[in-house]
Amino acid sequence: MNYDVLIIGAGPGGIFSAYELVLRNPDLKIGVLEAGHPLNKRKCPINGTTVKSCIGCKTCSIMSGFGGAGAFSDGKYNITNDFGGTLFEYIGKKRALDLMKYVDEINMAYGGQGTKLYTTAGTKFKKLCIQNDLHLLDASVRHLGTDINYVVLENLYAYLQDKVDFHFDTPVRSIHQVGDGY
């Protein structure tokens, strides 16, 4: 099959890349290759009784699959340039924050509505820190929680699944040019 765009990985970068490409150019033929399983098939065998620790599965359902390594996290999304990455070094602080807020809006639209956005800016705690020569980093944090984080991923997949070809359990080890494609 030939694709206009082939995305490697269905973690947040791959999911949001596919999402934006679908929105901006719905005629593109998009494929996503993911080493792990679909979200609904991601199951870790550790159960605390018969399997108490990692058994080294060929494909780790905690680290790989739709949603990436954060799929089963507590769903905290930081909106800040003060920590967590250096995107702002490439596109500027305002643009980086605007993009983080845009991702937050998408998360809200796909199941995260009703969750709380916390902030350190302008708080009594921030003032107390300054008075005591402590330097609290400014951040807004959306706390979706584990369950809502999963719902957001389910809803994003439901939106994308008929617009993008997902190929799960398809690790990519190398890329080679074949004719005019790869």
Predicted segments, located by residue:
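Gly/Ala-rich phosphate-binding loop of Rossmann-like dinucleotide-binding domains
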Residues: A18, V22-L23
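A conserved short coil-to-beta-strand element within the FAD-binding core of flavoproteins
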Residues: L144, F168-G181
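Conserved N-terminal/central alpha/beta ligand/cofactor-binding core
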Residues: P38-R42, I46-K163
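Short beta-strand "acidic-cap" motif of Rossmann-like dinucleotide-binding folds
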Residues: D27-E34, L39
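Hydrophobic residues embedded in beta-strands of well-ordered beta-sheets
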Residues: Y77, G181-Y182
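Generic structural signal for residues in well-ordered beta-strands
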Residues: I30, F166-F168
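Conserved structural-core and active-site-/substrate-pathway-adjacent residues in large, well-folded domains
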Residues: I7-G9, S17, G75, L156
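Beta1/beta-strand and adjacent pyrophosphate-binding region of the FAD-binding site
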Residues: M1-G13, G31-L33
